[in-house]
């Protein structure tokens, strides 16, 4: 597989959001309150944060085929400094071709370079193929995740 993984730079916010929207393909779904313009604005805010990295995987034709985001999170008393992979999305035509592994490797390297002791990743319960991929990549099934919506999206 001939892909290159590089960090997104300012000005590429809309392209990153396009990659995120691949998460809406089955078995995923579009969130009911999804607003693409708001997502582009949030991506610009995220790109300005030094504790966050957004990555693009590109084919040899420079086509966007995958995206990932990772951020430094809490310093846990029990486990040390955590990095969280917020998003990892691969274009449907490029799945099972090494793109996700390339993005994951790059995100893990970034986390290690930035002092993280471990990486946390949540994945929707319906994404069983993604779960198998994460386990093949050496992850352990460590927790169940729960969510409360406490306000309106900004």
Kindly label every feature range from the protein language model.
Residues 125, 134-144:
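Conserved acetyl-CoA-binding loop of GNAT-fold acetyltransferases
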Residues 90, 96-109, 136:
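Conserved acetyl-CoA-binding loop-helix of GNAT-fold acetyltransferases
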Residues 4-17:
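A short beta-loop-alpha structural element at the N-terminal edge
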Residues 18-33, 76:
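Helix-loop element at the rim of GNAT/NAT acetyltransferase active sites that forms part
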Residues 95, 120-130, 147-149:
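Conserved beta-strand-loop-alpha-helix junction that forms the acyl-donor binding cleft
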Residues 44-56, 84, 140:
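A short helix-loop-beta-strand connector motif used in the catalytic cores of GNAT acetyltransferases and
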Residues 111-123:
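Conserved GNAT acetyl-CoA-binding A-motif
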Residues 54-56, 63-72, 84, 89:
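Conserved beta-strand in the GNAT
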């Amino acid at each position: 597989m001939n892909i290159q993984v590089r960090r997104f730079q300012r000005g590429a916010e809309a392209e990153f959001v396009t990659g995120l929207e691949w998460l809406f393909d089955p078995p995923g779904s579009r969130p009911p309150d999804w607003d693409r313009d708001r997502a582009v604005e949030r991506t610009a805010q995220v790109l300005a944060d030094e504790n966050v990295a957004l990555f693009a995987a590109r084919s040899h034709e420079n086509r966007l085929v995958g995206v990932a985001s990772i951020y430094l999170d809490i310093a846990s008393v029990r486990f040390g400094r955590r990095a969280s992979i917020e998003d990892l999305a691969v274009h449907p035509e490029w799945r099972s071709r090494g793109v996700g592994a390339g993005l994951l490797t790059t995100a893990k390297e970034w986390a290690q370079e930035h002092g993280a002791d471990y990486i946390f990743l949540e994945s929707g319960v319906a994404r069983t193929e993604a779960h198998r991929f994460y386990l093949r990549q050496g992850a352990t099934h460590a927790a169940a995740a729960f969510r409360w919506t406490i306000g309106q999206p900004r």
